[in-house]
């Protein structure tokens, strides 16, 4: 029996605890865009609590702040970076066409 018990003992690995994403001095507010943008995906979705590693209360406050910022138009509902990239590339093409015509 002693041999079978020894098989299941795991070695203790040391691990480094990550810093919390929200420090004690950070204020969760819809005006704090630098903080809010860290918790939004590339598509503009609010990241889950497991991904953010936040407490339930912090996640609730972040969600409310993001929704307020979206309603007040300081944050887009969808992330439109790809649309801006396309518009810039089309501007380059049109300027090249105009140069070729002259």
Curated annotation (Swiss-Prot):
Gene Ontology process terms (BP): translation
Pfam families: Ribosomal_S18 (PF01084)
One Gene Ontology MF term: structural constituent of ribosome
Domain of life (superkingdom): Eukaryota
The entry's keywords: Chloroplast, Plastid, Ribonucleoprotein, Ribosomal protein, RNA-binding, rRNA-binding
The keyword GTP-binding belongs to this UniProt entry's keyword annotation: no
GO cellular component: chloroplast; mitochondrial small ribosomal subunit
Gene3D superfamilies in UniProt: Ribosomal protein S18
Location in the cell: Plastid, Chloroplast
Subunit structure: Part of the 30S ribosomal subunit.
Family the entry assigns: Belongs to the bacterial ribosomal protein bS18 family.
NCBIfam families on file: S18
UniProt xrefs under HAMAP family: Ribosomal_bS18
Protein name, per record: Small ribosomal subunit protein bS18c
Gene, per the UniProt record: rps18
